[in-house]
């Protein structure tokens, strides 16, 4: 058996607006659900013993974050902004000690809201709502360790410490 820490469950989530890169003190949404970005690469199909899809790992397809709020009011508060921070804590079991503790994660993302669900209102319901953000910037941290850093405006794509665009950027800059 390997000594891999177990990330058991998400214990709490808070979403903050971050206008001009400054995180607001109070969250806009608490105990909401955040679907973190999926990083997928565009592919080109070539013929090599049949068809074969080759991923262009220096580029990414559309990067989206979905925030499911517990009320329409929370979603409306988020709609006023283009930069966000989602913080969540996971209950973690340390493989070496067997002890449980919390691990903090932070997702910084900015872009344009693609869609906003109008929500559902019914007797006894919370009138929940969902917004989808198309991200031009996305950065995910586990504590202070950077897991993903994608910035379309700067041509940055770093995944688990590996700069996926460094060679391409050097060629484009003539270095």
Please tell me what each predicted stretch does.
Residues 112-175:
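Mixed-charge, glycine-accented linear interaction segment located at domain edges/termini
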């Amino acid at each position: 058996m390997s000594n891999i820490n177990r990330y058991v469950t998400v214990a709490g989530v808070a979403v903050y607006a971050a206008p001009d890169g400054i995180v607001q003190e109070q969250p806009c949404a608490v105990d909401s659900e955040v679907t973190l970005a999926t990083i997928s690469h565009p592919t080109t199909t070539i013929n090599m013993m049949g068809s074969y899809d080759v991923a262009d790992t220096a580029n990414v397809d559309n990067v989206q974050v979905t925030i499911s709020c517990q009320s329409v009011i929370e979603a409306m508060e988020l709609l006023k902004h283009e930069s966000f921070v989602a913080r969540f804590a996971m209950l973690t079991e340390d493989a070496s000690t067997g002890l449980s503790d919390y691990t903090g994660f932070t997702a910084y993302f900015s872009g344009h809201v693609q869609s906003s669900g109008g929500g559902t209102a019914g007797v006894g319901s919370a009138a929940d709502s969902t917004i989808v953000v198309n991200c031009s910037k996305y950065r995910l941290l586990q504590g202070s360790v950077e897991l993903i850093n994608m910035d379309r405006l700067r041509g940055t794509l770093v995944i688990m410490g590996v700069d996926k665009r460094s060679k391409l950027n050097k060629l484009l800059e003539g270095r």
